[in-house]
Swiss-Prot record:
Optimum temperature is 25-35 degrees Celsius for N-terminal 209 residue fragment. One of its GO terms (biological process) is carbon fixation. Zn(2+) binds at residues 75, 102, 107. Its cofactor is Zn(2+). Disulfide bonds join 194-200. It comes from Nostoc sp. (strain PCC 7120 / SAG 25.82 / UTEX 2576). It is found in: Carboxysome; Cytoplasm. Its EC number is 4.2.1.1. This is Carboxysome assembly protein CcmM. One of its GO terms (molecular function) is carbonate dehydratase activity. Residues 223-315 are annotated as: RbcS-like repeat 1, SSUL1.
Length: 555
């Protein structure tokens, strides 16, 4: 049943407009607008509030059994055409049995294949969506060809072909949802046709039919799927958790050369109020800095500190997400628990979690980011004096969470012994870090509280110094190892404001040749830069690269 709308308003193209060709079995609602050379196939439903204007770009084709829902806009540019399934050129081609849902925008040149589903408020512009694709809500598809049978999640922004090629395949539950929506609109079409037929509508009006409301909840979308094409599901879960906890979100980028020195540069500030806005801002940062490292961080605006740092893109591509991140059930508190994630990063508030300190987790993260291998060794008190260490089970893990689990297993197996963490350069086949993480009297205290006075001449240490030091025994061990390995030491500092941008300032290399002199210089730096972040740097003078970065003082 074809219904003609009111006359089109005058435009520069009005004089040469062709008449729309509408199949007699199609239903076009009186409150819709169809202008120009539009071919509408059999059993099509055009709902109220739609605007199909083939005046500037022309012609349009809408295949049989397609339903176009309320508020859909189909328009085309004067230039640009797509090739339809009949090998003719069209400004817009919509195939058979397709579904364009509420408020969708199809702007030509555009192609939507057979049995495709375009979700609410999604936009297709200068693009081709293959047959059998499902596009969920609020998505943008522009300047790409989406292969057939692909799933575009809600909020996705697909603007380059690499993104389109990486899209996941449609799953059965996605088809079920699309068929559910299409079924409702086919029922509407039958209802509209019945309403126009007095013989059909009269008996229904005379019947007293009790209405009911279904309590069944339809699964609208795959909750575990990627809700953004460029970002993993795990990153999205982290963003959602941070926003729910009232934290701010930021992002930083750095090229491969500066990554070694930790010279991160902030991306554009993210003022997002919703997950969708935050994801869009992150994707913009990824697009602007492809081929670089990009990391996401969360900020506690009250404590003015970071609660999360995780790398979401590496130069060889986006970090593959996993489902290992689990948002805590309650707000983060003072215990500063560490949460591992599939990107090989974690976040901590400076205390301990389980059997591994937050400082050890930071060291693990730095070693993995530098491409180093990680190992562990243990020794009892008697053999500690002779340095007869034994290796624990080899660690083949590539993420911080897996390494932490392996460390905890080693700690459980060798309670009452010394255990140390080893960083190994697989290319040079040498050690870049040796750090004791457990002593017979318990776990090594983290160095996140630089004000604590710790004696370096502890009975459990194999080497004694003449004076007490503000540094923790772990930092003293690191200084000893760096000097013993022939490396240089340096100090960097930064205030709280510049810490967010990673703008560290160096005090220059420490020229000390003995452990005592180096500790004295480090303590002088801590006093000079009280109230700032201070980190210790180990430098390989031959390879001219850093072998250690560890924060030894916080504000």
């Amino acid at each position: 049943m074809a219904v003609r709308s009111t006359a089109a308003p005058p435009t520069p193209w009005s004089r040469s407009l062709a008449e729309a060709q509408i199949h007699e079995s199609a239903f076009v609602h009186p409150f819709s607008n169809i202008i120009g050379d539009v071919h509408i196939g059999a059993n099509v439903i055009i709902a109220p509030g739609t605007s199909i204007r083939a005046d500037e770009g022309t012609p349009f084709h809408i295949g049989e059994n397609t339903n176009i829902q309320d508020g859909v806009v189909i328009h085309g540019l004067e230039q640009g055409r797509v090739v339809g399934d009949d090998n003719k050129e069209y400004s817009v081609w919509v195939g058979s049995s397709a579904s364009l849902t509420h408020m969708a925008l199809i702007h030509g040149p555009a192609y939507v294949g057979d049995n495709s589903f375009i979700g609410f408020r999604s936009t297709v512009f200068n693009a081709k969506v293959g047959a059998g694709c499902i596009v969920m809500m609020h998505a943008l598809i522009k300047d790409v060809e989406v292969p057939p049978g692909k799933y575009v999640p809600s909020g996705a922004i697909i603007t380059n072909q690499k993104q389109a090629d990486r899209l996941p395949d449609v799953q059965p539950q996605d088809r079920d949802f699309a068929h559910h929506v299409i079924g409702i609109n086919q029922a509407l079409r039958a209802g509209y046709l019945c309403a126009a037929d007095s013989k059909c509508i009269a008996p229904l009006r005379n019947d007293q039919v009790k209405s009911y409301t279904s309590t069944t909840v339809i699964g609208l979308e795959r909750s575990s799927e990627v809700a953004s094409n460029s970002l993993g599901a795990e990153t999205i879960e982290q963003v959602r958790y941070l926003l729910e906890q009232g934290y701010k979100i930021g992002s930083e980028h750095v090229d491969q050369r500066r990554f070694r020195t930790g010279s991160w540069t902030s991306c554009q500030p993210i003022e997002a109020r919703s997950v969708g806005d935050a994801l869009a801002a992150l994707e913009a940062c990824l697009a602007d800095h492809s081929g670089e490292y990009v990391r996401l961080f969360g900020i506690d605006p009250k404590g003015k500190r970071r609660v999360l740092e995780t790398i979401i893109q590496r130069p060889d591509g986006v970090v593959a997400g996993s489902t290992s991140f689990k948002a805590p059930a309650s707000n983060t508190n003072g215990n500063g628990s560490y949460h591992s994630n599939g990107n090989g990063n974690g976040y901590s508030n400076g205390a301990t979690s389980g059997k591994v300190s937050a400082e050890t987790v930071d060291q693990i993260r730095q070693l993995l980011a530098g491409g180093y291998k990680i190992g562990t060794e243990h020794v009892d008190e008697r053999r500690f004096r002779t340095g007869s260490w034994n290796s624990c089970k080899p660690i083949e893990a590539t993420s911080a969470g897996e390494v932490v689990a392996a460390l905890e297993e080693c700690i459980d197996s060798h309670q009452g012994e010394y255990i140390r963490l080893i960083g190994i350069d697989p290319k040079a086949k040498r050690r870049v870090l040796e750090s004791i993480i457990q002593r017979p009297n318990g776990q090594v205290a983290p160095s996140s509280s630089p004000r604590t006075v710790v004696s370096a001449s502890s009975a459990s240490s194999g080497t004694a110094t003449a004076t007490a030091t503000r540094l923790s025994t772990e930092v003293v061990d690191q200084v000893r190892q760096i000097l013993g390995g022939g490396y240089k030491l340096s100090i960097e500092h930064v205030d709280q404001r510049r810490f967010r941008t990673g703008s560290w300032s160096s005090t220059g290399a420490i020229s000390a040749t003995s452990e005592r002199e180096a500790i004295a210089v480090i303590e002088a730096s801590l006093s000079e830069f009280a109230g700032e972040y201070v980190r210790l740097i180990g430098i390989d003078p031959k390879a001219k690269r850093r072998v250690l970065e560890t924060i030894i003082q916080r504000p």
